A protein has these predicted regions:
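Non-heme Fe(II)-dependent double-stranded beta-helix
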Residues: 2-54, 61-169
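Non-heme Fe(II)/2-oxoglutarate
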Residues: 15, 29-34, 82, 210, ...
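Extracellular structured ligand-interaction cores
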Residues: 57, 143, 172-178, 189, ...
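Short, solvent-exposed loop/turn segments at secondary-structure junctions
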Residues: 65-67, 147-148, 167, 184-186, ...
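Short, structured patches in soluble enzyme cores that scaffold and shape functional sites
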Residues: 145, 150, 164-166, 175, ...
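Short, surface-exposed loop/helix-turn segments at secondary-structure junctions
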Residues: 158-163, 211-224, 255-257, 276-282
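Short, conserved beta-strand element in jelly-roll/cupin
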Residues: 167-187, 231-234, 239, 264-267
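Double-stranded beta-helix
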Residues: 184-247
Length: 329
């Protein structure tokens, strides 16, 4: 294997030109949980549930143990070949070209299948939070990356952004998520931002927008004071509806670094054998998804430096290696 050649997997056609993650389908055939199944919530409280319905996002405290989150953060630093206590190592040119230009300078870390990432994906509390959101136990986890967002330097051009990963006109049955790997309680240090008011009023708002508007980047004029900067502590999981306009805010702190892992789940597509095999190959060969927002790591470090992640019983099902319905696949 040539370490200078990025190892990626061809995305489905549906994801070639949109930001969404190609390790799962764009929209589930199963509707998000409306509680009509009568099942009790496992992780979310009733207050959490009402907040989710009204605001389009919810924070699950201590979704993974704090120490586990910090271990993952230490790995992200290692993978990026940077030192947390030496700012001189923090800034370097991008290793690969990002087609999705608003992500340039946002700190995306092109690692997808390391053991530390899978440890978080197969944590029971993370899984059960998503079962509350979906109302089904049979889920697949996204194969997604991490983020290391450094303080801006004079002359840096990253201004943050608000977007959708899926066209809201399609009413996607999908959710996304981000796990804090370090405390993000200082609003100046970058991190997740969203506009719940636009989430709530989208159908009315769109009537005032031009027909040829960018379906993925809303004009947020009038919503500037409605931006919510969500505070998280290491180990907290934020889940948000894919209809939620969201993005990364710039890091205006002096020396604080935002570190996160992107994790989401959606109903398993066990009849989609091509996608199931695609996911297994990604895990087994430590290969990144290929898509509009996923350039991969040209160094090939996942393939050359790290072994295949070990999966527990839950992890095997969340990947698709074992089937929820029939045992082993």
């Amino acid at each position: 294997m040539n370490p200078d050649t990025p190892q990626t997997m061809a995305a489905t056609n549906a994801h070639k030109d949109i930001p969404g993650n190609p390790s799962t389908v764009m929209s589930s055939r199963i509707m998000l949980n409306d509680r009509s199944n009568g099942k009790p919530l496992k992780v979310l409280s009733e207050t959490d549930w009402q907040f989710w319905v009204h605001n389009g996002y919810v924070v699950v405290k201590n979704a993974v143990p704090r120490e586990q989150a910090l271990r993952t953060a230490a790995f992200v630093w290692e993978f990026e070949d940077k030192k947390p206590d030496d700012p001189a190592t923090w800034y370097s040119a991008p290793r690969a070209e990002m087609q999705m230009k608003e992500l340039v300078g946002s700190g995306m870390v092109e690692v997808y299948n390391h053991q530390r990432l899978w440890d978080n994906r197969q944590t029971q509390r993370v899984y059960e939070a998503f079962t509350d959101i979906w109302g089904t136990d049979q889920l697949w986890v996204t194969i997604d990356r991490a983020n290391l967002n450094f303080p801006l330097r004079p002359g840096d051009t990253f201004k943050g952004f608000i977007h959708w990963d899926y066209d809201p006109e399609t009413k996607p049955q999908n959710v996304q998520g981000v796990l804090a790997l370090a405390d993000q309680t200082d609003e100046n240090m970058g991190g997740f931002q969203c506009i719940p008011e636009l989430f709530r009023t989208y159908d009315t708002w769109k009537l005032s927008q031009p027909a040829d508007r960018d379906r993925f980047k809303p004009d947020i004029t009038g919503f500037e004071d409605q931006l919510v900067k969500v505070r998280l502590e290491a180990g907290d999981l934020l889940i948000f509806h894919s209809m939620q306009p969201h993005g990364i805010r710039p890091n205006h702190s002096k020396d604080k670094v935002r570190i996160a892992q992107y994790i989401s789940m959606m109903p398993a597509e066990e009849n989609n054998e091509a996608l199931r095999q695609w996911r297994i190959k990604s895990w087994k060969e430590r290969i990144a998804p290929e898509g509009y927002a996923f350039p991969g790591d040209p160094r090939g470090w996942e393939q050359n430096k790290y072994p295949v992640a070990e999966l527990n019983e839950l992890g095997r099902k969340l990947l698709g290696l074992d089937r929820w319905s029939k045992g082993k696949g």
